[in-house]
UniProtKB/Swiss-Prot annotation:
Signal peptide: none annotated. Keywords: Cell membrane, Cytoplasm, Hydrolase, Membrane, Phosphoprotein, Protease, Ubl conjugation, Ubl conjugation pathway. It is found in: Cell membrane; Cytoplasm. The lineage of its organism: Eukaryota, Metazoa, Chordata, Craniata, Vertebrata. Disulfide bonds: none annotated. GO terms for biological process: cell motility; endocytosis; membrane biogenesis; membrane organization; protein deubiquitination; proteolysis. This is Josephin-1. It comes from Bos taurus. Transmembrane segments: none annotated. GO terms for cellular component: cytoplasm; plasma membrane.
């Protein structure tokens, strides 16, 4: 089973109305080259200056010094399509940890109030200009709470996608985790990870 676009609960979503208050200011960094890991990190922190391509490249080189043997390989390997090790190391520089979620478990066991945000890795369609190719590639996205509601801040979206409250978020996560090659990371402060207080079942 592959990941399919999130449609939500159609019956409920049609009857739901957004809060009448002014919408929150949401930082949504959009896709540029193959920098989805960078965009996901900056969207989690809601800060365009949280990380740069250069800082992630430095972390990548520190973790894999032998991959940068010659200058011509640097541009090939440093294309911004970073793996989970770079994301985890980047979060640690800010005092945060990435907790891998075992998708066999119920997402109801996540203590949402102790989680700053979520980074998901899932298959995404490749595009060539306006054309969508019949190919998929793994892609990093951010989901987090802003102003009392959860949003999908996928850098490929034109604008933030409103998910809703905690129950809608859990449905969103369950929907994607049922798919093939979909993984979930919880972004939590170091002390939360140390005490495992991201778990609601302890």
């Amino acid at each position: 089973m592959s990941c399919v676009p999130w449609k939500g609960d159609k019956v409920k979503s049609e009857s739901l109305e957004l809060p009448q208050a002014a919408p929150p200011q949401i930082y949504h960094e959009k896709q540029r080259r193959e920098l989805c890991a960078l965009h996901a990190l900056n969207n989690v922190f809601q800060d365009s200056n949280a990380f740069t391509r250069e800082t992630l490249q430095e972390i990548f080189q520190r973790l894999s010094p032998n991959t940068m043997v010659t200058p011509h390989k640097k541009s090939m390997l440093g294309n911004g399509n970073y793996d989970v090790n770079v994301i985890m190391a980047a979060l640690q520089t800010k005092g945060y940890e990435a907790v891998w979620w075992d998708k066999r478990r119920d997402v109801g066991a996540i203590a949402l109030t102790n989680v700053m945000g979520f980074i998901m890795n899932l298959p995404s369609s490749l595009c060539w200009g306006p054309l969508k190719l019949p190919l998929k590639r793994q892609h990093w996205i951010c989901v987090r709470e802003v102003g009392g509601a959860y949003y999908n801040l996928d850098s490929k979206l034109k604008m933030p996608e409103w998910i809703g409250g905690k129950s809608e978020l859990r449905k969103f996560l369950k929907h994607h985790l049922r798919g093939k090659n979909c993984e979930l990371l919880l972004v939590v402060p170091e002390e939360v990870e140390a005490h495992q207080s991201w778990r609601a079942d302890v």
